[in-house]
Amino acid sequence: LVLKPSFTFAQSCCEPQNQADFQLLADNKAFRMSHDEPRPFTFVSLTGGEMMTFKTPDGKTANGFLLKAKSKSKKYLFVYQEWWGLNDYIKQEAEKWYNELDGQVNVLAIDMYDGKIATNRDDAGKYMKEAQEPRLEQIVKGAIDFAGRRAKIASIGWCFGGGWSLKSALLEGKRAVGCVMYYGMPVKEVEKLKTLRTDVLGIFAGREKWISKEVVADFEKNMKSAEKSVTTKIFDAEHAFANPSNPNFDKAATAEAFKMASNYLKTRLLN
């Protein structure tokens, strides 16, 4: 990862310019401390969800937690992890979405860290910072290939995964039917955004310093320039307010955001 000279990590400012810079926030103490460490938790799926592997274009394999639709379906929801990795909270969230979508959609929570899972801030920061964009893209492309050429794919993610939810939609091409990003770093390049084949629902936190209101405003402007549709909601909340692994999540804001995301995803995947 290359740090742009114009980007600084003073704890009082810090607006990352792209996903690579966002990952370097792992070195920022204020950013690390904005993530409460998850409590120990073991998830047992009640709907047949299980870990699986899929091939990636670079000749390797990647991991995912898959909940198969009750009846054969080409519809998929990709779930992108927080900076902790594909932990049991994300698996639980994947099953929550599986049930919310009435078991009619395949739900795949994608392991972006190749098996590494953090339980503390130091390890989470280390894993996020070490994640290499070429490999991350290969993992996403492998998941898209697994879904198949005729798949209809929507995505959702938080923080690190919020940025990758949008990048996933870009990589999905014509298979993309929806994208929900929770306080993730938006893609800034208008030419890239022009290739989007779906609209975007962006859920953001008004009290945070990193994916700030200014970053959101720039994203809206860039999407307009790209002639793409985006709906944004800025909650009066802190970064990570709705993270599945957050033991101190904002209950009211999380519930409202979930309802927004649910209405959006049901419209794109069930209608």
Please describe what each predicted stretch is.
Residues 12-45, 50-147, 245:
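Serine-hydrolase catalytic machinery in alpha/beta-hydrolase-like enzymes
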Residues 92-93, 212-222:
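Short alpha-helix in the alpha/beta-hydrolase fold that links the catalytic acid
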Residues 147-158:
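Alpha/beta-hydrolase fold nucleophile elbow
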Residues 157-161, 165:
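Gly/Ala-rich beta-loop-alpha elbow adjacent to hydrolase catalytic centers
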Residues 175-185:
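A conserved short beta-strand
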Residues 202-204:
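Short beta-strand/loop motif that positions the catalytic acidic residue
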Residues 207-211:
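Acidic catalytic loop of the alpha/beta-hydrolase fold
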Residues 226-271:
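C-terminal catalytic histidine-bearing segment of alpha/beta-hydrolase fold enzymes
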